[in-house]
C-alpha cells in the first residue's frame, strides 16, 4: 500500500527560469518552484504505534520534482545533534551571566537521502518549511521556502546557480602543516588486531562548543533565536560531512557575548586565534567540559581569510579551537567553512593540486568555492588517519553513556541506550556481524560488538593491549577478559624521565625546551645558550618569571630557565630570540613541568624546584 502511494501521489512543479529573486541565501539565477508534499508513512508491519506527543516527527518523507522528475526525500531527525547536557549562555546588559538548559530534543533538524539514489545525502531544517541542501545524482541542490503568499511554494536550485556575494575569493589562513613538527610514523600495521588500527576504526564523538562574539550578535539584530537557529543549521550540516569519517558532532554549548567580547576579536587571525585559545583554556574549559570550541564573528579578517585553526590539535586545552568569519548568508556555505577548520584540528592540511573531488572542490581546499563541498579528498583522509595514529586523541572516544541519552530509545541511531545491547545503525548501513540491526540485540553466541576489547564478537583474552602507550608519558591499557570495554585511559606518573632523559613527564606530556622552540620558531630552532636566560633576572618588559597584580617579578638566578624561553635559529645571527603576546601572558614562556636542571622542573609558580617536591 505504501509503495502504491509513492507511485500515485503526483506533484505539479512550476519551473521558472531566466530571472532572479532575493532569497535568504542571496541572489539565485536559475531555480525551480516546487510544492513538496508530505507522504504519510507507517512503521514496519503497517501498525501505527502511539508515540509521545512531539512537535516534529522522528522520520518524514516528502515528494517533489527535481528537473521535472519526481523524487522522494527521506528524512530522519538528527537525534545526536545536541549533547545530553546541552546548555546556552548569554549576558545581561549589565554583564551578568545567564545560563539555561533549553529543551532541544524535539528539534527540527534532519539528515536524509533521496530514494533510489545510494550516493545521495541531505541536511534539512524543517522548522519553517524545508531549508537546506541535498545531493542527487552527483549534483548538489539547495531548497528553501519561497517567501510569497503561497506558503507551500519552495525554490530548488543547483548550488552553482547561487551568485557570489563577493567577487573576491575566500580562503583559509592556515599555512602550517601541524601544531608541532611532523613526526615520522614508525609503526607496523600488518596485524589487523593492532591497537592503533583499532583506534582508527572506532566511532568518534566531538562535543562542540560554539562561541558567538558581540559583532555577530549585533549583526543578527541582537536576536538570540535567530543566532541559535543559524548555529543549529550549520552544525547539523557539518555532521553530514563528518559521517563520512565515522565522526559524530554533538553541540554541547553555545555562548553568546551579548554584553561585550571576552577577548579582543581583531582582523589579525593569528592574534585572535591565540587569544581565543587562551580564553578557552583558562575560562571556558574550567566551567564547561567539551572537546572543541569555535568562535563565530562578523569581524572582517585581514585579506581574503575567513577561517583559521590549529592543525592536529584536538583535545589540547589551548589549541583545540578555530575562528570563523560569518562571511555568507548561506548556512550551508558557512557549514563548509566550519567543516574545513575542524578538519585542520583533526590533522588535515590543505589539498594540493593532486587532491581532487568531483564535481566540486574538496572540503580541505584552501580556496572556498561558491558551491558547498561534498567530500574529503583521499589526501585529507590520509592526513587524518596519520594524525589519529600519531596522537591517539582520547577525548573523542567518549561516547555518551546509556543513561546520558535523554531522547527516547531508538534502534538504528548508532547509540546504545538503556535496554539495548548494541546499535550498528539502520539495516541498510549496518556492517556488524555481531549486532542485529533490526532489534539492536547481539546475535546468538555474540558477547560484544564494537568495543575495544571485542574481537570477532567475543571478549579479547586478558592481557591483550587495547590502548597502546603513545609515548614515554603514557601507559598501555589491557583487556581484562571479562568485559568488552578497555579500562580507563591512564598516564605515566608526573616526574618520570622522558625523551631520553631530556625531560620529565607532566600531565601526560614531556615538555622540553627544544620542542617548545620548534613550535615557536620552526624546525630549525633550538634552545639558546644559558647566558640568554640571565635576561629574565631583569624583570623588565617581557623578561620575567611571573606577574603578580600586574607587576613583573624578575627571576632569581636559579629560576631563570622558568621565565621567558630563548631560542636560536640556524639561519639567524641573533642568539637570544624570544616571543611574547600582548593578549596572552603565557605565550613564549617556558612551559610548566619543563626540566630546568638535573632532577629539577618549573612548577606552577615558575620556580625551579626539586622533582621530588614538585608534584
Curated annotation (Swiss-Prot):
InterPro entries reported in the protein's UniProt record: ADAM_Cys-rich, Disintegrin_dom, Disintegrin_dom_sf, MetalloPept_cat_dom_sf, Peptidase_M12B, Peptidase_M12B_N, Reprolysin_adamalysin
SMART domains: ACR, DISIN
A biological process term (GO) from this entry: proteolysis
Disulphide linkage map: 315-395, 355-379, 357-362, 411-440, 422-435, 424-430, 434-457, 448-454, 453-479, 466-486, 473-505, 498-510, 517-567, 532-576, 545-555, 562-602, 596-608
Motif (D/ECD-tripeptide): 472-474
Binding-site list for Zn(2+): 340, 344, 350
Cofactor: Zn(2+)
Signal peptide: 1-20
Binding-site list for Ca(2+): 410, 413, 415, 417, 423
Function: Snake venom zinc metalloprotease that may induce platelet aggregation.
Name the record gives this protein: Zinc metalloproteinase-disintegrin-like
Native organism: Cerberus rynchops
Amino acid at each position: 500500500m505504501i509503495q502504491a502511494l509513492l507511485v500515485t501521489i503526483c506533484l505539479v512543479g512550476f519551473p521558472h527560469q531566466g530571472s532572479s529573486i532575493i532569497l535568504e541565501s542571496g541572489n539565485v539565477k536559475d531555480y525551480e518552484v516546487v510544492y513538496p508534499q508530505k507522504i504519510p508513512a507507517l512503521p514496519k508491519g503497517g501498525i501505527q504505534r502511539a508515540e509521545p506527543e512531539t512537535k516534529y516527527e522522528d522520520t518524514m518523507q516528502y515528494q517533489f520534482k527535481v528537473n521535472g522528475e519526481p523524487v522522494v526525500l527521506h528524512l530522519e531527525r538528527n537525534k545526536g545533534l545536541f549533547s545530553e547536557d546541552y546548555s546556552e549562555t548569554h549576558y545581561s546588559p549589565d554583564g551578568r551571566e545567564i545560563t539555561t538548559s533549553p529543551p532541544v530534543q524535539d528539534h527540527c533538524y534532519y539528515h536524509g537521502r533521496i530514494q533510489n539514489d545510494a550516493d545521495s545525502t541531505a541536511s534539512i531544517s524543517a522548522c519553517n518549511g524545508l531549508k537546506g541542501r541535498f545531493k542527487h545524482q552527483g549534483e548538489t541542490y539547495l531548497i528553501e521556502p519561497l517567501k510569497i503568499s503561497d506558503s507551500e511554494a519552495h525554490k530548488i536550485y543547483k548550488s552553482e546557480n547561487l551568485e557570489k556575494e563577493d567577487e573576491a575569493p575566500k580562503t583559509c589562513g592556515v599555512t602550517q602543516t601541524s601544531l608541532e613538527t611532523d613526526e615520522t610514523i614508525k609503526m607496523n600495521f600488518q596485524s589487523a588486531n593492532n591497537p592503533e588500527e583499532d583506534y582508527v576504526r572506532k566511532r568518534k564523538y566531538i562535543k562542540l562548543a560554539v562561541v558567538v562574539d558581540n559583532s555577530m550578535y549585533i549583526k543578527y539584530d541582537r536576536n538570540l533565536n535567530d543566532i541559535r537557529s543559524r548555529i543549529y543549521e550549520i552544525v547539523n550540516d557539518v555532521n553530514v560531512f563528518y559521517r563520512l569519517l565515522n565522526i559524530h558532532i554533538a553541540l554541547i554549548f553555545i555562548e553568546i557575548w551579548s554584553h561585550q567580547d571576552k577577548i579582543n576579536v581583531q582582523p589579525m587571525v593569528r592574534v585572535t586565534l591565540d587569544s581565543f585559545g587562551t580564553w578557552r583554556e583558562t575560562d571556558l574549559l574550567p566551567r564547561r567540559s567539551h572537546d572543541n570550541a569555535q568562535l563565530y564573528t562578523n569581524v572582517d579578517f585581514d585579506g581574503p581569510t575567513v577561517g583559521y585553526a590549529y592543525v592536529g590539535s584536538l583535545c589540547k586545552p589551548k589549541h583545540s579551537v578555530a575562528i570563523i568569519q560569518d562571511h555568507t548568508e548561506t548556512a550551508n556555505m558557512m557549514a563548509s567553512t566550519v567543516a574545513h577548520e575542524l578538519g585542520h584540528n583533526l590533522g588535515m592540511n590543505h589539498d594540493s593540486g593532486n587532491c581532487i573531488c568531483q564535481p566540486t572542490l574538496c572540503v580541505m581546499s584552501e580556496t572556498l568555492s561558491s558551491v558547498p563541498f561534498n567530500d574529503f579528498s583521499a589526501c585529507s583522509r590520509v592526513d587524518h588517519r596519520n594524525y589519529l595514529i600519531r596522537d591517539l586523541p582520547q577525548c573523542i572516544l567518549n561516547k555518551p553513556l546509556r543513561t546520558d541519552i535523554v531522547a527516547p530509545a531508538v534502534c538504528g541511531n548508532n547509540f546504545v541506550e538503556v535496554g539495548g545491547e548494541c546499535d550498528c545503525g539502520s539495516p541498510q548501513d549496518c556492517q556488524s556481524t555481531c549486532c542485529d540491526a533490526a532489534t539492536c540485540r547481539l546475535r546468538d553466541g555474540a558477547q560484544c560488538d564494537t568495543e575495544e576489547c571485542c574481537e570477532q564478537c567475543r571478549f579479547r583474552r586478558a592481557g591483550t593491549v587495547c590502548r597502546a602507550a603513545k609515548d614515554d608519558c603514557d601507559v598501555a591499557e589491557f583487556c581484562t577478559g571479562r568485559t568488552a570495554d578497555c579500562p580507563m585511559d591512564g598516564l605515566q606518573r608526573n616526574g618520570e624521565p622522558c625523551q631520553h632523559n631530556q625531560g620529565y613527564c607532566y600531565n601526560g606530556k614531556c615538555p622540553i625546551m627544544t620542542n617548545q622552540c620548534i613550535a615557536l620558531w620552526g624546525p630549525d630552532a633550538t634552545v639558546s645558550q644559558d647566558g640568554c636566560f640571565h635576561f629574565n633576572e631583569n624583570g623588565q618588559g617581557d623578561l620575567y618569571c611571573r606577574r603578580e597584580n600586574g607587576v613583573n617579578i624578575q627571576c632569581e638566578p636559579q629560576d631563570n630557565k622558568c621565565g621567558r624561553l630563548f631560542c636560536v635559529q640556524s639561519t639567524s645571527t641573533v642568539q637570544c630570540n624570544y616571543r611574547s603576546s600582548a593578549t596572552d601572558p603565557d605565550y613564549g614562556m617556558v612551559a610548566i613541568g619543563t626540566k630546568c636542571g638535573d632532577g629539577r622542573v618549573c612548577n606552577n609558580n615558575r620556580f625551579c624546584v626539586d622533582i621530588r617536591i614538585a608534584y
